[in-house]
């Protein structure tokens, strides 16, 4: 078993490495999208992409995709909507029927997000894109990108220290920041902040004076985990 003394420290930091990974992702794919959640981790990914575009003088719009899961906290929805009309982004806001699962008091139940056979918890924003039929959330990417011959990457704000499952999934890949997407052969998943800690995330947001979703302030006050993820799976 590896010991702490076996660690090899590099003369770099996660910020510099994050920018390098963003550059590698864009240089090795035909099409790149960031899957934005409104949360702190994907927000950092988005801002790293902006930094990369600015440094390289890239004038293309940044492809941003958001999936509104209907039962998300409204503070998250309102925060995400502030990005929709930003001229820097090609922003796709999806609010469509997705077959998913939710756990209520330890019991697993089926939930169709934005089910057209019932009243919705909240009305869809005017900018929302709705696909025909009901889709599975794990094949959503395939429906959007899987029919293309282009090499596509979806960037996620996944971090290894969030859970052992995520740590195992990241370290199992030969290239930790680019992993295969099991949904389609032409797709990969980019994880430029996989080795960032939560303190690194907030340090970056603070030093760059970047506004984040205010739900985190409430969670800190209540001593809750700092997450924007909904209860659906």
Segments and roles (model prediction):
Residues 1-35, 40-233:
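Nucleotide-activated chemistry modules centered on ATP-dependent adenylation/adenylyltransferase
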């Amino acid at each position: 078993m590896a010991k702490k003394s076996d660690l090899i420290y590099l003369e770099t930091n996660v910020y510099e490495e994050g920018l390098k990974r963003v550059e590698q992702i864009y240089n090795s794919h035909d099409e790149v999208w960031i899957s934005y959640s409104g949360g702190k981790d994907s927000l950092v990914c988005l801002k790293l992409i902006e930094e990369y575009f600015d440094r390289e003088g890239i004038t293309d719009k940044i492809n941003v995709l958001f999936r509104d899961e209907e039962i998300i906290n409204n503070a998250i929805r309102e925060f995400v909507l502030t990005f929709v009309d930003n001229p820097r982004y090609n922003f796709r806001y999806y609010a469509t029927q997705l077959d998913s699962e939710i756990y209520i008091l330890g019991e697993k139940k089926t939930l169709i997000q934005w089910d057209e056979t019932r009243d919705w918890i909240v009305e869809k924003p005017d900018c929302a894109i709705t696909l025909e039929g009901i889709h599975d959330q794990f094949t959503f990417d395939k429906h959007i990108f899987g029919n293309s011959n282009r090499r596509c990457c979806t960037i996620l704000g996944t971090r290894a220290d969030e859970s052992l499952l995520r740590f195992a999934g990241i370290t199992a890949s030969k290239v930790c920041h680019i992993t295969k997407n099991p949904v389609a052969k032409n797709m990969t998943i980019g994880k430029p902040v996989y080795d960032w800690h939560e303190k690194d995330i907030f340090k970056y947001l603070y030093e760059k004076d970047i506004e984040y979703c205010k739900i985190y302030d409430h969670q800190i006050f209540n001593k809750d985990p700092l997450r924007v993820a909904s209860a659906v799976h």
